[in-house]
A protein has these predicted regions:
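N-terminal glutamine amidotransferase
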Residues: 1-169
Length: 169
């Protein structure tokens, strides 16, 4: 049993409220899936940029200095914005494949949650309200979003088992 919510905003004036609206919807679905939750937020893409949302069980160790190491290896600017066990890497779009390959090589403990120009996926084990709070989803803006609450029935309760999933950019 799971719960799925989604919101596509047609009114640009509501975009700053997307995270708050989506969080409230997700919390309402807690009874359908209290084991874990995930949220995908689609923001405005930045021309010439791409993003990877990454996750680590050892975020302090894996994320400290990661942007600098990637920048050095790629010869291009990379920024990292950390949110609890997740972080968003922002880099030149023409370096997307190289960035991902370099990340896998220099930070093998880091997992990619999403890849693209506008998507960010955050997911963890825990009640939906707690997961949303950890990543400050209510403060996010965007054009649309998807949320999922999970009650594991046939598999383990894990971060990687939480939805949504991203198939690539």
């Amino acid at each position: 049993m799971c719960g799925i919510v989604g919101l596509f905003l047609k009114d640009k004036a509501l975009e700053p409220q997307l995270g708050s609206l989506l969080t409230d919807m997700l919390i309402t679905m807690t009874d359908r899936g209290p084991d874990s939750a995930g949220i995908a937020v689609y923001g405005a893409p930045q021309a010439g940029h791409a993003k990877l949302t990454i996750q680590s069980d050892n975020a302090a160790q894996d994320f400290d200095g990661l942007a600098e190491r990637l920048s050095s290896e790629l010869g291009a600017p990379v920024t990292l914005t950390r949110k609890d066990t997740h972080a968003v890497l922002d880099f030149p779009a023409d370096k997307a494949s190289e960035t991902r390959a370099t990340l896998e090589r220099i930070a093998p403990g880091v997992r990619v949650m999403s890849a693209g120009e506008s998507i960010e996926i955050y997911k963890e084990v825990g009640l939906p309200k707690d997961v949303a709070a950890r990543f400050e989803i209510s403060k996010m803006s965007g054009t649309h979003g998807i949320g999922h609450t999970r009650m594991a029935t046939e598999s383990a309760v894990t971060t990687m088992g939480a939805h949504p999933f991203n198939t690539g950019s």
